[in-house]
């Protein structure tokens, strides 16, 4: 019987399935950070247990770490305690850990693939909703809660219910200036933030196959924003070439056997999906979110929607509330929206490809006078090193953009990087909820190139026109 990629990944990790469908799944890789792990380790201690499989765990501090000079440590006492607790747990249990001063440190969903800790065919979990990122490698990857973090530490398994399967098929050549971020925002704009609820999404089609691994990670990263449990992309040569030679990748005959298996990680011809959604890449334009949900998004040449034209009363009410919070009026051209800050970073868009795209836009230009701050936060110390070897840091600095240390930063404002009330930000992150980047802050989700262009012009602009 023809199987989907999701079927294959699920079935290969089933330990036991109960009469009600509840399944014990084996977990290959467990990623941990400082925010959702302290209570899990405390539970482990109280029960007198130790991690079942030490080598399956990889820990890093990312949410609370400062992106400015780290010589003086972390100023905020709560943030400092979380990171110190992570340090202590890593040492007590002998788990692999990239501390704040380790050059391999970075955002957990950047360092996993970078180190080869994420490999095709794995089940990958983390106490973080954007764990779906790792599905780009043909993995079954999703976020878990703190109690589940403890369960995985103790048993290397997870209780789960199988989701339905959705196929998002994107075909055609991607227009100039349109990126993976624009694809996934367009998908969410089409199906809504609840469109993927109850599903695991496979992203496929000629457009997806043409993307780099960085682009595929961007798309899978935001599968959760469509409501999906997981997002994934089939394995191909691009996948295999990316993981080859990574520190934790197999070598020698183990590599050969792994590749043979990895090449089976695709949906079979004739495999049945519960829902199929199609997009024509040629019709996708650079996207800009205007509201307080990722589904509130339009093309850069569009206008802020008018709630009066929305027939669904619930959606209309949400739109009206979003416009009030965002201080926008219906029918305002997107290109008339002025910004105060720019944030280029996050687990969505902080990899080397993202930084190159942003640098290409700002090269030889300078930040607009009304933009108070434009910051670039690499996804890891290794991404930062590579960018500096390529001279990208100098391009950003010359354009008036700040070059920072790696971390989650302004994506969720748990460290000192945040918006002040009323400030408006062009952000390459994944969530534009109320207060996400700071109390009263207003977030617009865009691609790295679009964020860079807004920083130069002081308002949203079609990056395709700016390039020319």
UniProtKB/Swiss-Prot annotation:
Question: What EC number(s) is this enzyme filed under?
Answer: 4.2.1.33
List of residues binding [4Fe-4S] cluster: 347, 408, 411
What cofactor does this chain's UniProt record say it requires? [4Fe-4S] cluster
Q: Which UniProt keywords apply?
A: 4Fe-4S, Amino-acid biosynthesis, Branched-chain amino acid biosynthesis, Iron, Iron-sulfur, Leucine biosynthesis, Lyase, Metal-binding
Q: Which Pfam families match?
A: Aconitase
Q: Which InterPro entries match?
A: 3-IsopropMal_deHydase_lsu, Acnase/IPM_dHydase_lsu_aba_1/3, Acoase/IPM_deHydtase_lsu_aba, Aconitase_4Fe-4S_BS, Aconitase_4Fe-4S_dom, IPM_dehydratase_rel_enz, IPMI_cat
MF annotations from Gene Ontology:
3-isopropylmalate dehydratase activity; 4 iron, 4 sulfur cluster binding; metal ion binding
Name the reaction it catalyses. (2R,3S)-3-isopropylmalate = (2S)-2-isopropylmalate
Record bears the keyword Aminoacyl-tRNA synthetase? no
State its role. Answer: Catalyzes the isomerization between 2-isopropylmalate and 3-isopropylmalate, via the formation of 2-isopropylmaleate.
User: What do we know about how this protein assembles, alone or with others?
Assistant: Heterodimer of LeuC and LeuD.
Name used for this protein in its record: 3-isopropylmalate dehydratase large subunit
Query: Native species of this protein?
Result: Janthinobacterium sp. (strain Marseille)
User: Organism classification, top ranks?
Assistant: Bacteria, Pseudomonadati, Pseudomonadota, Betaproteobacteria, Burkholderiales
């Amino acid at each position: 019987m023809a199987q989907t990629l999701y079927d294959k990944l699920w079935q290969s990790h089933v330990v036991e399935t109960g009469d009600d469908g509840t399944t014990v799944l084996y977990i290959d890789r467990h990623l941990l950070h400082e925010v959702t792990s302290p209570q899990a380790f405390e539970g482990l201690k109280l029960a007198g247990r130790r991690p079942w499989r030490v080598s399956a765990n990889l820990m890093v501090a990312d949410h609370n770490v400062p992106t400015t000079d780290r010589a003086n440590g972390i100023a905020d006492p709560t943030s400092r305690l979380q990171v110190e607790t992570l340090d202590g747990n890593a040492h007590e249990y002998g788990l692999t850990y990239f501390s704040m001063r380790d050059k391999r440190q970075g955002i957990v969903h950047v360092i996993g693939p970078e180190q080869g800790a994420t490999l095709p065919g794995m089940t990958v979990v983390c106490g973080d909703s954007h764990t779906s990122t790792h599905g780009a490698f043909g993995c079954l990857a999703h976020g878990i809660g703190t109690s589940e973090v403890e369960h995985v530490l103790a048993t290397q398994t997870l209780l789960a219910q199988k989701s339905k399967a959705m196929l998002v098929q994107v075909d055609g050549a991607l227009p100039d200036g349109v990126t993976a971020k624009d694809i996934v925002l367009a998908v969410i704009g089409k199906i809504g933030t609840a469109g993927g609820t109850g599903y695991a999404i496979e992203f496929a089609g000629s457009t997806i196959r043409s993307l780099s691994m960085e682009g595929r990670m961007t798309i899978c990263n935001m599968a959760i924003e469509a409501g999906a449990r997981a997002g994934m992309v089939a394995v191909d040569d691009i996948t295999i070439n990316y993981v080859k030679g990574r520190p934790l990748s197999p070598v020698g005959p183990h590599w050969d056997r792994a590749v043979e298996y990895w090449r089976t990680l695709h949906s079979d011809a004739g495999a049945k999906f519960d829902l199929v959604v199609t997009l024509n890449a040629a019709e996708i334009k650079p996207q800009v979110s205007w509201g307080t949900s990722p589904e509130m998004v339009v093309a850069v040449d569009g206008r802020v929607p008018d709630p009066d034209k929305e027939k669904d009363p619930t959606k209309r009410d949400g739109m009206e509330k979003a416009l009030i919070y965002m201080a926008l009026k219906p029918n305002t051209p997107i290109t008339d929206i002025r910004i105060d800050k720019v944030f280029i970073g996050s687990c969505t868009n902080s990899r080397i490809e993202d930084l190159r795209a942003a640098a290409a836009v700002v090269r030889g230009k300078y930040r607009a006078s009304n933009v108070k701050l434009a910051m670039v936060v690499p996804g890891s110390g290794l991404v930062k090193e590579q960018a500096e070897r390529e001279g990208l840091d100098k391009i950003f600095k010359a354009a008036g953009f700040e070059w920072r240390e790696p971390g989650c930063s302004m994506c969720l404002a748990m460290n000192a990087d945040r918006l002040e009330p009323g400030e408006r930000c062009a952000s390459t992150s994944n969530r534009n909820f109320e207060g996400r980047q700071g109390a009263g802050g207003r977030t617009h989700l865009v691609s790295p190139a679009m964020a860079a262009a807004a920083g130069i012009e002081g308002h949203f602009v079609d990056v395709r026109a700016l390039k020319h």
